[in-house]
């Protein structure tokens, strides 16, 4: 078995839980946030800096790395870890979400998806088998099944057909996997915003006995209340002894609520993307540093933050860098945002360990506005 999960503690007042995910490249404390390294880099950060921020695992993107530089080149480099000089665990997504969100003029069949590259318009065909082959070339520690991610909103019949297809594709991924002892393969629960389809997907996916399970197809434009309601009805059908991963979620309030419901793993481009838009994440909510109000503001992003950025630079300087389109500005805001989110997860874990998660959550929300 490539990974093993150990449930260590469950909150007495919610479904929040602490665990350890053991992989060939190290142990991960859960809950955990995974910074996204789409193109074999977490934008503007070096692997060494990510380690200093205590990032335990990062995410790589199958679709993007297949198109550029090509999974054959990554394989020749002896895998993604060597290629990007990262010796901690890596999770790769299956490329499914990107095929459905970025791929132009896509055509879905039982075999797979035909689409056009968002880079040069060339015609490509992705199948469950192809996705697994690419992820095996990349050499990630955790792979994901190739799934169909339906849009929001979508009609019941379409989502049902899509969900059934994802189950069939999941079986094909399992059958095509060559080295389950080296690389874990997680299943993905779909079903759109329909609780009965989510239940059906969860039950059928868990029958396939994956070492971990993701909840996909959420945070795709639906209202927050709907997303949390669907998540809450899905999680009870996932086994307690396996890790649970909520795909594409990375704001503090969503993470806290999902942890309360029993989610262990998160990934999102949010902290790095908003940094490049000139926004800093804080425990009081987002701070749009590029705004004119910070032109003469010489205090740090957060007074009590002990990250490198807050210890050394002012809001005024960061605003100047962002307005001047200087790379350092985007880099420093990315640094702060990742530090903030990883530290938040550490505090959250400590609150679960102390069995006062709900009190900690209420205290956080008193200040936080988003």
Curated annotation (Swiss-Prot):
Q: What class of enzyme is it?
A: transferase
Pfam families with a match to the protein in the record: TGT
Instruction: Write down how the cofactor binds this protein.
Output: Binds 1 zinc ion per subunit.
Provide the cofactor list for this protein: Zn(2+)
Q: Which domain of life is it from?
A: Bacteria
**What residues bind substrate, as annotated?**
93-97, 147, 190, 217
* Recorded catalytic activity of this chain's protein: 7-aminomethyl-7-carbaguanine + guanosine(34) in tRNA = 7-aminomethyl-7-carbaguanosine(34) in tRNA + guanine
- Region: RNA binding; residue ranges are 248-254, 272-276
Annotated Zn(2+) binding lies at 305, 307, 310, 336
Q: Which UniProt keywords apply?
A: Glycosyltransferase, Metal-binding, Queuosine biosynthesis, Transferase, tRNA processing, Zinc
Q: Which GO terms describe its biological process?
A: queuosine biosynthetic process; tRNA wobble guanine modification; tRNA-guanine transglycosylation
Report the GO terms under cellular component.
cytosol
Q: What is its EC number?
A: 2.4.2.29
Annotated GO molecular function terms are: metal ion binding; tRNA-guanosine(34) queuine transglycosylase activity
Listed pathway(s): tRNA modification; tRNA-queuosine biosynthesis
Which InterPro entries does this one have? ArchSynthase1/Queuine_TRR (IPR050076), TGT (IPR004803), TGT-like_sf (IPR036511), tRNA_ribo_trans-like (IPR002616)
* Residue numbers annotated as active site: 93 (proton acceptor), 267 (nucleophile)
Q: Which family would the database say this protein is a member of?
A: Belongs to the queuine tRNA-ribosyltransferase family.
UniProt subunit comment: Homodimer. Within each dimer, one monomer is responsible for RNA recognition and catalysis, while the other monomer binds to the replacement base PreQ1.
Q: Which NCBIfam families match?
A: Q_tRNA_tgt (TIGR00430), tgt_general (TIGR00449)
Task: Provide the function of this protein.
Answer: Catalyzes the base-exchange of a guanine (G) residue with the queuine precursor 7-aminomethyl-7-deazaguanine (PreQ1) at position 34 (anticodon wobble position) in tRNAs with GU(N) anticodons (tRNA-Asp, -Asn, -His and -Tyr). Catalysis occurs through a double-displacement mechanism. The nucleophile active site attacks the C1' of nucleotide 34 to detach the guanine base from the RNA, forming a covalent enzyme-RNA intermediate. The proton acceptor active site deprotonates the incoming PreQ1, allowing a nucleophilic attack on the C1' of the ribose to form the product.
Recorded hits in HAMAP family, A to Z, give: Q_tRNA_Tgt
Instruction: Write the protein's name.
Output: Queuine tRNA-ribosyltransferase
Query: Source species, please?
Result: Natranaerobius thermophilus (strain ATCC BAA-1301 / DSM 18059 / JW/NM-WN-LF)
Q: Report which gene this protein is encoded by.
A: tgt
